[in-house]
């Protein structure tokens, strides 16, 4: 079992920290993003995205690549589309990171033709701030062993409220 898998099992209550468990507290980070489009063949309504990412520091961008090589790191996230706008132009996704790579969420969705709202760097046609929110954090307290969980509510404004987004986009 990898360290990440162990962390999820502990936080979900399916396993106990014990011999071989990471000495550091295990963190489970969740995010919310508004993405272009709705579920399709490239991005079903839920799943796991697994890619190899290459960070090009000279260009200031991260690119998905086909296979591992020097400078390439695996990126894995789990997502679920929880809501899609009536016209199908935008969707709200909940995301759990299994790895934490630079621009990981942005690149993995954009590479499947679903860039984040406002993310012109990775292909969004929508103008505005990038619609990516750190939504939650879970960890086991290092001294008490208590499971700690913190959640943020979804903002009630465009583009987070998809109905308000449709009005905002059409203006």
Region annotations inferred by a language model:
Residues 1-166, 170:
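RNA pseudouridine synthases
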């Amino acid at each position: 079992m990898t360290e990440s898998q162990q962390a999820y099992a502990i936080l979900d209550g399916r396993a106990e920290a014990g011999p071989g468990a990471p000495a550091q507290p295990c963190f489970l980070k969740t995010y919310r993003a508004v993405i272009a489009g709705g579920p399709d063949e490239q991005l079903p309504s839920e799943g796991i995205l697994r890619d190899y990412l290459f960070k090009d520091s000279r260009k200031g961008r991260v690119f998905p690549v086909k296979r591992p090589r020097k400078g390439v790191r695996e990126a894995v996230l789990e997502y679920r589309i929880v809501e899609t706008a009536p016209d199908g132009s935008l969707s709200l996704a909940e995301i759990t990171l299994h790895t934490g790579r630079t621009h990981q969420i942005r690149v993995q969705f954009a590479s499947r033709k679903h860039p984040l709202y406002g993310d012109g760097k990775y292909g969004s046609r929508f103008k505005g701030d990038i619609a990516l929110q750190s939504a939650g954090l879970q960890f086991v307290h290092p001294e008490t062993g208590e499971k700690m969980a913190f959640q943020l509510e979804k903002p009630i404004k465009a583009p987070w409220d998809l109905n308000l987004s449709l009005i905002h986009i059409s203006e």
